[in-house]
Amino acid sequence: VGTVGRVTYFNYLITATVDSHVSIVRIDKQKADSLFIFYNLRWREKEIESTAEGSTGQVELSREKLKEMKILLPPLPEQKAIAEVLSSIDNKIDLLHRQNKTLEEMAMTLFRQWFIEPTKDGLPEGWEEVSLGEFIKEILGGDWGKEKPEGEYKIKVNCIRGTDISDLQDSLPKKTPIRFIKQSKFKSIEPKDGDIILEISGGTETQSTGRSIYISSFNRQLFEYPIIFSNFCRLLRPKENYYTYYLYLYLKYLYINDEFFSLENGTSGIKNLDYKTLLYDLKYPMPKNTEIYLSFYENVSILFEKIDKNKFQIQTLEKLR
């Protein structure tokens, strides 16, 4: 239901059951390697999904049709060898994901140590209350373009939406749609290295708007085409490139601490972030000395560069797999 065709491999020493919307595929180990079958089925998720039956929104997998699916089955030793190679790639991908999570946590820890913890007992000497907008050169609106080439809409791009930002933060841009926009519009809104894309519309009752992602020469390579962003996002262009990670981490810090819920307006279905109040009206304690921001950038940039390189390696391994 909702996820027809998705496959996972259960390899845990725990007692567990599944509900009626999940099918267990139990392999005859004399004929096939279970891990090999798992990879085969995962590769064919779309095919499995096409066997689903029922009304729109309440479709279920046809177990009978699943049984009828044909599979090219090499000799058992060859199956095991193939599964071992694929499993090794998966383990490497998982390791890189966990490494990135650790690196991101390290960057956030440094941010807290430099800019949050010093203010717990009041405003330190050499600090002042200023808005995040003091660090921003300009804010640009996005464009959704067209689904197909039409008239002047000829430039093929990947368009980042708010929902894609979560993928970009955690892993890779897997579902970023392809759109077509005008050349003039592309030139005016194409993100540059050091820019930040901020989600301003979306959210739910339990998840606020306000997710963000920085743009770099590394994560730009993760996309098939040049990138733009939708009109449900805003591009923040820092006055200096060394403000990028400071702004990104500050926005993320506010987001994970649920500060953006109080800045939302709109209907119950679609929430809009009052980003102008966030960036220009609210004041936060910040150091006056710009050398502090430059030093912070030098400390965390190596972490983010490693994160981006890991993402590129993950993408390469996934294509290989």
Predicted feature descriptions by range:
Residues 68-144, 288-321:
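Non-catalytic DNA-recognition/assembly elements of restriction-modification systems
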Residues 10-11, 215-216:
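Short beta-strand-to-turn element immediately C-terminal to the catalytic PLP-Schiff-base lysine
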Residues 6, 18-19, 133-149, 163-206, ...:
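Sequence-specific dsDNA recognition surfaces
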Residues 12-15, 23-77, 131-139, 153, ...:
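Basic, amphipathic alpha-helical recognition segments used for DNA target recognition
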Residues 7, 209, 223-224:
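Compact nucleic-acid interaction/catalytic patches
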Residues 84, 191, 210, 215, ...:
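Glycosyltransferase-associated regions of secretory-pathway enzymes
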